[in-house]
Amino acid sequence: MAVGKVVVSVASLLLVVGVAIGVITFVNKGGGANGDSNGPINSHQKAVQTICQSTTDQGSCAKTLDPVKSDDPSKLVKAFLMATKDAITKSSNFTASTEGGMGTNMNATSKAVLDYCKRVLMYALEDLETIVEEMGEDLQQSGTKLDQLKQWLTGVFNYQTDCLDDIEEVELKKIMGEGISNSKVLTSNAIDIFHSVVTAMAQMGVKVDDMKNITMGAGAGGAARRLLEDNDSKGLPKWFSGKDRKLMAKAGRGAPAGGDDGIGEGGGGGGKIKATHVVAKDGSGQFKTISEAVMACPDKNPGRCIIHIKAGIYNEQVRIPKKKNNIFMFGDGATQTIITFDRSVKLSPGTTTSLSGTVQVESEGFMAKWIGFKNTAGPLGHQAVALRVNGDRAVIFNCRFDGYQDTLYVNNGRQFYRNIVVSGTVDFIFGKSATVIQNSLILVRKGSPGQSNYVTADGNEKGAAMKIGIVLHNCRIIPDKELEADKLTIKSYLGRPWKKFATTVIIGTEIGDLIKPEGWTEWQGEQNHKTAKYIEFNNRGPGAATTQRPPWVKVAKSAAEVETYTVANWVGPANWIQEANVPVQLGL
């Protein structure tokens, strides 16, 4: 066979999966699939068994597909996706009816969280429509897209968990959990189906690649999507287009380093870049607020909307809706252009974790450089996010994020951060995305009296095989100036498992002596550590000693053990966005 891509139909791949994992039931001596004596199962039942065997909830999967009178795996998969779409629609309608039924008994926070639930469920529907559209009518020639479609399905699942994660009122959380449980189960099963196919393809040596320049249709919101391709020779993801590479280069050209090791500091003034919109507090730009500039960007933009935010302190909360895709913001330096706001769950009525964010990115293709993001609520405000990113393919360079609890919310999609500073106390890097933070400075702060510090809190609740998790590569984890004197008495940990399959990997990183010898800790009242995945490899510094790590933390001995978590494999296919001088080369 000639070397090159092998394009395989979904139908044939699903049959391969059935054989590969040994799930097709062969009937002997007239026995049924379950060992009964009701006669041999028909071809439809065999196909359903094949598809459903690898799912988390096989009973639900079979029940969904039983009414589909076909043995064509392609038709069954599409029918499953359509059933998932119907279930999410019902979840959205249930949310609206729940809100309406509460009437005057609903407080400001309940109103806010239910409105947020309606919004993210609509996003889930839009993405699911995209998935169905990209698979086509006959689902043929889809083999090369399956890994990407699985990533989008993971986002659909995360949108539904977002809703529940933001609800703190016990009774409302129970009501909503029951109301949207069916759509969560179906979405989870859909991810499992795609994962099995992709795994089988990899085992066969079939290349799982993404099609180029796939564009969403109007039914899915119309926002342009550019999928991943192969690795770039200069260390940039191929989904990071040539034009975007030039924009990033120009935005940083001639920028002096400064501050903490030059990370996240300095300024560029935009170099030779030509902004689409200019924001300036002194009136020298087209807009005085960032929100105005965002709303002036085109909806469903196939190109790039470029916003230059001139030096100044912008006291505003900025939300970038899903339809405002492909926005690139750049400032005049992370300590010169600062977006700040004071909003928190504890001190701001009608606020949830997601809604506390100073900047809230809900769109694809977001880029930022030379900007500071702050939430000034303080430690008494509890959850208070500086930046929340829900959109896929986020690339952020030379920025700074300051807060206390929940500073940086890496909540969905694939995200890459390079040369940033992020400060905080409790769970201050957290979320449910595939995120790599590289060559960055992580400052642990002093919080409320008696409060411990946790750098990370990953929220993977789907499964250990999913690309959901936080990777810190070639970073520095040290105390800030206020914590320095008390760094050995205040307990600080690398992280704790927010959800059942929490995944966090630390590679080639300097870990200061502020980190307790055990390194990691359990989530109070939960058993998530038993199924979580924590890996350390080739770290350095006094806090990197692993002799007292708990047994559920893996200390990798070779690069091969962490190859999955390179930029190329975790947020790719991709290569390093910039070369990093680390003692181990990953992805070789």
From Swiss-Prot:
The keyword Hydrolase applies. SUPFAM superfamilies: Pectin lyase-like, Plant invertase/pectin methylesterase inhibitor. It comes from the Eukaryota. One of its GO terms (molecular function) is pectinesterase activity. GO terms for biological process: cell wall modification; pectin catabolic process. SMART domains: PMEI (SM00856). Substrate binds at residues 353, 383, 496, 498. Residues 276-574 are annotated as: Pectinesterase VGDH2. It is found in: Secreted, Cell wall. Gene3D superfamilies: Invertase/pectin methylesterase inhibitor family protein, Single-stranded right-handed beta-helix, Pectin lyase-like. This is Probable pectinesterase/pectinesterase inhibitor VGDH2.
